Swiss-Prot record:
Originating organism: Schizosaccharomyces pombe (strain 972 / ATCC 24843) (Fission yeast)
Any single Gene Ontology cellular-component annotation: cytosol
Name of the protein in its database record: ASTRA-associated protein 1
UniProt lineage: Eukaryota, Fungi, Dikarya, Ascomycota, Taphrinomycotina
Family to which this protein belongs: Belongs to the WD repeat ASA1 family.
Assembly and interaction partners: Component of the ASTRA chromatin-remodeling machinery complex.
WD repeat boundaries on the chain: 12-50, 53-91, 246-283, 294-333, 336-368
């Protein structure tokens, strides 16, 4: 098994790094436990800008329409940021300036507004963020999936236009399309939603996967043409086609890759799940998942490279691990961090992977 070394380590955060994300260009975004976001230039490997996006932990980040950055925080906010790189100078933030900015604590937002006129809030939606489940976004289906506002065991689907409407008042709740999506009673008690993933298949169907506290992985399907239907009865749009208790501990991450669905949990399993090919598929018609016992408990995050050939997991033991998507065979161990890894990301279209850790560092690696 290959044991590579990182080609660069980014140091700029003063608290645990909870989310990391590449855009399609030369930037890497990282978010931390204190709510700060740093935009790193991958050419110079230095921070281009930083601001306090949230007052609490950042749960997740996504690049949405027009290259805007959407961040989800535990302060119950889903915020879309407009970043005008054309107005930025060629100067970079020094690490001392970055540390000074982060030392402002709760008042840092006012300081970042003074120093970052090229960063502005485009939309600000009030959501449920009391769990650790980040939002999911699908550019093809143009929907956003979040935990239900009141019930942690249910999901709500929002129109992604909510992310682009200019902020008109403080308490914007977005446009909800379907609400209270949950497994059928036959599945039993599932507990809180821990992770979600959304994809479009065959340009006809939208697949929604959810991993639950009980260890269940559940998949729902709807037609692409009906996904924007506004209804109080989610069953008029979504159909549950798959439910399997694939983990003995809570599911920590689910991720679609083409026609495959992968999941990891607090146990030591990676699971490859079958996916429905049609809305005509019924519950129980799909085969059982394929399991790989890794002997490493607590795989916090899973991501698949854009070529769908390899996947990587973020481990509580401070290791990133690389596996084959086809066989789930282990390929490499990414060993550098002194504490658990919270998040990871593949650069789109390249062999670079970023690992974000509780030790406040971000390591960059090149894989084959």
């Amino acid at each position: 098994m290959v044991v590579p070394t990182p080609f660069y380590v980014l140091r700029g955060h003063s608290s645990s790094v909870t989310s990391v994300l590449f855009d399609a260009n030369e930037y890497l975004y990282s978010g931390d436990e204190a709510g700060f976001v740093i935009c790193w230039c991958l050419t110079s490997m230095r921070p281009k800008c930083a601001w306090r996006a949230h007052t609490k932990t950042i749960l997740g980040m996504q690049i949405v329409k027009g290259g805007a950055l959407c961040t989800h925080g535990r302060d119950c906010r889903l915020v879309t940021w407009k970043i005008d790189f054309n107005c930025m100078t060629d100067n970079f933030m020094s690490l001392s300036k970055l540390a000074e900015l982060q030392n402002y604590g709760p008042e840092a937002s006012s300081e970042t507004e003074k120093s970052s006129a090229f960063i502005s809030i485009h939309s600000n939606i009030v959501v449920n963020s009391l769990t650790f489940c980040p939002f999911s976004y699908s550019p093809q289906s143009k929907i956003v999936v979040l935990c239900n506002t009141l019930n942690f065991e249910e999901l709500d689907v929002y129109d992604d236009e909510s992310l682009y409407h200019p902020q008109t008042h403080k308490e914007d709740c977005g446009k909800r399309l379907q609400t209270r999506i949950q497994p059928e009673e036959s599945v039993g008690k599932t507990g809180s939603v821990m992770s979600t993933s959304v994809t479009v298949t065959d340009e006809k169907y939208v697949l929604l996967a959810a991993g639950y506290e009980s260890g269940h992985v559940v998949q729902y399907i709807c037609s692409l043409e009906n996904v924007k239907t506004v209804t109080l009865d989610f069953k008029a749009v979504w159909k549950m086609v798959y439910a399997y208790k694939s983990h003995s501990q809570p599911v920590l991450s689910v991720e679609y890759a083409g026609s495959k669905l992968f999941s990891t949990g607090a146990d030591d399993c990676i699971c490859l799940h079958p996916t429905p090919s049609s809305i005509a598929d019924d519950l129980g018609s799909l085969p059982h998942p394929i399991f790989r016992k890794t002997k490493h408990c607590g795989q916090q995050n899973i991501r698949i490279r854009s070529d769908n050939k390899i996947l990587a997991t973020a481990g509580w033991d401070g290791r990133g691990r690389v596996y084959s998507c086809q066989t789930l065979a282990p390929l490499a161990v990414l060993k550098y961090h002194s504490d658990g890894i919270n998040s990871l990301a593949f650069h789109p279209g390249s062999n670079v992977i970023a690992l974000a850790s509780k030790d406040t560092r971000i390591s960059l690696w090149k894989l084959y």
